[in-house]
């Protein structure tokens, strides 16, 4: 028996009410954070590409929220297309951790602050590195956190690596980020900086 029919008979509800309830509880949300101040247009293009949207939809996601950064709405609008997912965007929020906690998947630029925000609330983001940044320390930190199984790194804005990371995410065996008092983050940063 179909789940909605069983619920309808059990609670004597109209089927349309059951479908609304099932939709509320089965909606899977992707949050994309591209950074608040430095635009990462290539990441916006990547997540809003037909291939990415199709893959996310096939993985069961139906909603996406894109934090595109202060003053960069035109970038989001330029690449946003109506389709199989409900997609909304916003410049900035004082509660990015709250946005992340509501998401089933976080896709993030490799900025240490955003990555750590996600890890601290128990999310394991798919991280995309902006290789165009000068003196890019982000890749070293992201790769170290990947080696420790805290997140997935798709590399630069390469769609093949990104799609592979999206597909791996659900089945990947992540490790939880240790508590800050254990000093792992400080060690990672010190080790990374010492190699520069």
Curated annotation (Swiss-Prot):
Transmembrane domains' residue ranges: none
Entry keywords, A to Z: Endoplasmic reticulum, Glycosyltransferase, Transferase
Transferase found in the keyword field: yes
Signal peptide: none
Gene Ontology molecular function, alphabetical: N-acetylglucosaminyldiphosphodolichol N-acetylglucosaminyltransferase activity
rRNA-binding as UniProt keyword: no
Any Pfam family: Glyco_tran_28_C
Catalytic reactions of this protein: an N-acetyl-alpha-D-glucosaminyl-diphospho-di-trans,poly-cis-dolichol + UDP-N-acetyl-alpha-D-glucosamine = an N,N'-diacetylchitobiosyl-diphospho-di-trans,poly-cis-dolichol + UDP + H(+)
Single Gene Ontology BP annotation: dolichol-linked oligosaccharide biosynthetic process
Matching InterPro entries: Alg13-like (IPR039042), Glyco_trans_28_C (IPR007235)
EC number(s) given by UniProt: 2.4.1.141
Subcellular location, record wording: Endoplasmic reticulum
GO cellular component: endoplasmic reticulum
EC class name: transferase
Annotated disulfide bonds: none
Free-text function comment from the UniProt entry: Involved in protein N-glycosylation. Essential for the second step of the dolichol-linked oligosaccharide pathway.
Subunit organization: Heterodimer with ALG14 to form a functional enzyme.
Family: Belongs to the glycosyltransferase 28 family.
Protein name: UDP-N-acetylglucosamine transferase subunit ALG13
Provenance organism: Yarrowia lipolytica (strain CLIB 122 / E 150) (Yeast)
Lineage: Eukaryota, Fungi, Dikarya, Ascomycota, Saccharomycotina
Gene name of the encoded protein: ALG13
């Amino acid at each position: 028996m179909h789940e909605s029919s069983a619920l309808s008979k059990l609670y004597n509800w109209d089927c349309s009410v059951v479908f609304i309830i099932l939709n509320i509880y089965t909606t899977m949300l992707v949050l994309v954070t591209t950074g608040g101040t430095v635009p990462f247009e290539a990441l916006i293009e990547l997540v809003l590409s037909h291939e990415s949207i199709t893959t996310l939809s096939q993985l069961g996601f139906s909603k996406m929220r894109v934090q595109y950064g202060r003053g960069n709405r035109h970038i989001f609008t330029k690449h946003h297309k109506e389709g199989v997912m409900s997609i909304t965007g916003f410049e900035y929020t004082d509660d990015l951790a709250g946005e992340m906690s509501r998401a089933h998947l976080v896709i993030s630029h490799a900025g240490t602050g955003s990555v750590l925000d996600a890890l601290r609330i128990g999310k394991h983001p798919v991280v995309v590195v902006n290789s165009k940044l000068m003196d890019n320390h982000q890749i070293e930190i992201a790769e170290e956190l990947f080696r420790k199984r805290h997140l997935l790194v798709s590399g630069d804005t390469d769609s093949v690596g990104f799609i592979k990371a999206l597909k791996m995410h659900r089945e990947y065996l992540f490790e939880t980020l240790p508590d800050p008092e254990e000093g792992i983050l400080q060690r990672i940063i010190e080790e990374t900086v010492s190699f520069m």
